[in-house]
UniProtKB/Swiss-Prot annotation:
Pathway: Pyrimidine metabolism; UMP biosynthesis via de novo pathway; orotate from (S)-dihydroorotate (quinone route): step 1/1. Substrate binds at K69, N114, R115, L116, G117, F118, N183, N188, N257, T258. It is found in: Cell membrane. This is Dihydroorotate dehydrogenase (quinone). GO terms for biological process: 'de novo' pyrimidine nucleobase biosynthetic process; 'de novo' UMP biosynthetic process. FMN binds at A65, G66, L67, D68, K69, T89, N150, N183, K228, T256, G279, G308, Y329, T330. GO terms for cellular component: cytoplasm; plasma membrane. Its main location: membrane.
Length: 351
């Protein structure tokens, strides 16, 4: 059980600039992991196993990518009770991201807007951090936690050359991942969402599937690949994506990323900032895409539901919409690590 009441930490952190608070938190987690300090945020892992994409998830609540972009805090995050943790997005080369300020809180809506832009230390540093984590050094047979590695393209890479970046990242992370997520839906890298269109997605996933086949043959292990999509899609676009995922043998879909829509936060401070909106206002849009995906993909295709989970009831709504497991990020910032256990128990109690 966590020794530190999150309300106290949140009051302090929310008095700071949003990105400065984020960096301070990540530094604290990185320094405190694998030490007695970890008891400050440690929570029991709820047991609710599920088999999905050939993997055994210890429970159905995971961490969404974006919180730990450089894979510095895997062990600290594992201690919060997640069944799986996804880190990244990583790009082949280090990049600073977009100019600051680039992260904003909308507390009245329990939301965030960010335009970070895949700021990260690059593939080599990312992989080195993954390799150093206890989750990896103790071996896959010893660690129950599943680790997802999320990959993207550099901002300076022309969109027509994006496939090259994804294949470079796939090759780099492949030996260390329980699953890989292909991020084609961040609104903060110019033209990235164009990769969700019919022809572009077909080309990208075809190349990824072929390269995954080569890596699996060489390394003797087939790593599941998920694709992360946006909530800002109509039913026709969702149907095309669903067909393309199945055509190329993708193992699952992560639905959804942040939204560029602002309907739910109009008039609030920072609502006009450019970037992706996350948190409570995204819940229904994300759930709508999940329902459409489930209808298009059938009952067996794995869906990771993410977007707007700030309570146990929100997590349950994702499962009822058609997700198999869920991820949280903004909810962790507003509600703290206790949300992980509450959500996992609520989902377990559905059965």
């Amino acid at each position: 059980m966590s020794l530190l009441p999150y309300a106290l930490a949140r009051s302090f952190l929310f008095g700071m600039d949003a990105e400065a608070a984020h960096e301070l938190t990540m530094d604290m987690l990185a320094r405190g992991q694998r030490t007695p300090l970890q008891w400050a945020w440690c929570n029991e892992t709820v047991s609710d196993p599920i088999e999905l994409a050939g993997l055994r998830f210890p429970n159905r609540v995971g961490l969404a990518a974006g919180l730990d972009k450089n894979a510095r805090c895997i062990d600290a995050l594992a201690a919060m009770g997640f069944g799986f943790v996804e880190v990244g997005t990583v790009t082949p080369r280090a990049q600073p991201g977009n100019p600051k300020p680039r992260m904003f809180r909308l507390p009245e809506a329990r939301a965030l807007i960010n335009r970070l832009g895949f700021n990260n230390e690059g593939l080599d540093a990312f992989v080195a951090n993954v390799q150093r984590s206890q989750v990896r050094t103790q071996g896959r047979g010893q660690s129950k936690l599943l680790l997802g590695l999320n990959i993207g393209k550099n901002a300076t890479t022309p969109i027509e050359d994006a496939t090259r970046d994804y294949l470079t990242c796939l090759e780099g992370v492949y030996p260390h991942a329980d699953y890989v997520t292909v991020n084609i839906s961040s609104p903060n890298t110019q033209n990235l969402r164009a990769l969700q269109s019919d022809a572009a997605l077909d080309c990208l996933l075809g190349a990824i599937a072929e390269h995954r086949g080569q890596l699996a043959a060489a390394q003797g292990r087939r790593v599941p690949i998920f694709v992360k999509i946006a909530p800002d899609l109509d039913e026709a676009q969702v149907a095309v994506i669903a067909t393309t995922l199945q055509r190329h043998g993708m193992d699952g879909v992560v639905a959804t990323n942040t939204t560029i829509r602002r309907d739910a936060v109009q008039g609030l401070r920072h609502a006009g900032e450019t970037g992706g909106l996350s948190g409570a206002p995204v819940l229904e849009a994300s759930n709508a895409v999940i329902r459409q995906l489930r209808a298009a993909l059938g009952p067996a295709f794995p869906i990771i539901g993410v977007g707007g989970i700030l309570s146990a009831e929100d997590a349950v709504s994702k499962i009822r919409a058609g997700a198999d497991v869920v991820q949280i990020y903004t909810g962790l910032i507003y509600e703290g690590p206790a949300l992980v256990g509450r959500a996992a128990k609520a989902i377990r109690d559905l059965r």
